Amino acid sequence: MAAARISFSSTSRTSYYRHSPFLGPKPTPTTPSVYPITPFSPNLGSILRCRRRPSFTVCFVLEDDKFKTQFEAGEEDIEMKIEEQISATRLAEKLARKKSERFTYLVAAVMSSFGITSMAVMAVYYRFYWQMEGGEVPFSEMFGTFALSVGAAVGMEFWARWAHKALWHASLWHMHESHHKPREGPFELNDVFAIINAVPAIALLDYGFFHKGLIPGLCFGAGLGITVFGMAYMFVHDGLVHKRFPVGPVANVPYLRKVAAAHSLHHSEKFNGVPYGLFLGPKELEEVGGLEELEKEVNRRTRYIKGS
């Protein structure tokens, strides 16, 4: 659609009027002229007359709204392209930062895991080696160590469930809250709980390693069980669920997929925070009627893994 603008300009034009004898008589019927027209004729002033008439010129200036719309659309396209470039740059920076954070946490996890695992293996080997130096095999002590190792690992699941609900989501929420928010940097304040749980494990291992007898053997087993649980918790919770580092074939274990899906439902708070435990999370959801949602979450995570 075009809009019209009208402008007027005024000009003047000179018109000369002269009566020709060949066109008939003059319009004045009273005194016909028989003399030819000469420069000395007395009527020359009336014959040759100069009259200026005003002349108006109308100019139409058209504004093409379509062209204006196209121009504005072109500006919008340029702005959108600039915004897309800025968004792409920010996305690339965010991905690079996330990659750096994952690498940093992976290095820390590998170093701590390798250090703790190697110390635990060496402690188990040398402890039983010293126990059998006299030729006698302390079966009761060895059985106690093994039993407490398994018992402590299983017991830590129930301890973690209780502490998670009664402490971390209550009086210690100011620390645990960092785990329920987008993480900034490779670490979060919630990681302090891993260090807190490592303190009794190290103390029990130390006492059981440097002492002989049934009680030191039980303490050594308890410290070993806490250590094993902490390692498994880190790989499943931090690696498989929150993808803070790659876990490899661990992600293909069917039950661990359910565990990861159950913990994702904990963060969604669909069942008032249930499950609070980790490895027995699917069982907790079954108790509150959340198996259907659990299956949906498992399928969603499976499609995501296959798509990526």
Swiss-Prot record:
The chain crosses the membrane at residues 105-125, 139-159, 191-211, 215-235. It is a multi-pass membrane protein. Residues 152-279 form the Fatty acid hydroxylase domain. GO terms for molecular function: beta-carotene 3-hydroxylase activity; hydrolase activity; metal ion binding. A motif (Histidine box-4) lies at residues 263-267. It comes from the Eukaryota. The keyword Magnesium does not apply. GO terms for biological process: carotenoid biosynthetic process. Its main location: plastid. It catalyses: all-trans-beta-carotene + 4 reduced [2Fe-2S]-[ferredoxin] + 2 O2 + 4 H(+) = all-trans-zeaxanthin + 4 oxidized [2Fe-2S]-[ferredoxin] + 2 H2O; all-trans-beta-carotene + 2 reduced [2Fe-2S]-[ferredoxin] + O2 + 2 H(+) = beta-cryptoxanthin + 2 oxidized [2Fe-2S]-[ferredoxin] + H2O; beta-cryptoxanthin + 2 reduced [2Fe-2S]-[ferredoxin] + O2 + 2 H(+) = all-trans-zeaxanthin + 2 oxidized [2Fe-2S]-[ferredoxin] + H2O. It is found in: Plastid, Chloroplast membrane. A motif (Histidine box-2) lies at residues 176-180. Its EC number is 1.14.15.24. GO terms for cellular component: chloroplast membrane. Keywords: Carotenoid biosynthesis, Chloroplast, Hydrolase, Iron, Membrane, Metal-binding, NAD, Oxidoreductase, Plastid, Transit peptide, Transmembrane, Transmembrane helix. InterPro entries: BETA-OHASE-like. It is an enzyme of class 1 (oxidoreductase). A motif (Histidine box-3) lies at residues 237-242. Inhibited by o-phenanthroline and 8-hydroxyquinoline. Residues 1-59 form a transit peptide. A motif (Histidine box-1) lies at residues 164-169. Nonheme diiron monooxygenase involved in the biosynthesis of xanthophylls. Specific for beta-ring hydroxylations of beta-carotene. Produces beta-cryptoxanthin and zeaxanthin. Uses ferredoxin as an electron donor. The histidine box domains may contain the active site and/or be involved in iron binding. Belongs to the sterol desaturase family. This is Beta-carotene hydroxylase 2, chloroplastic. It comes from Capsicum annuum. The gene is CA2.
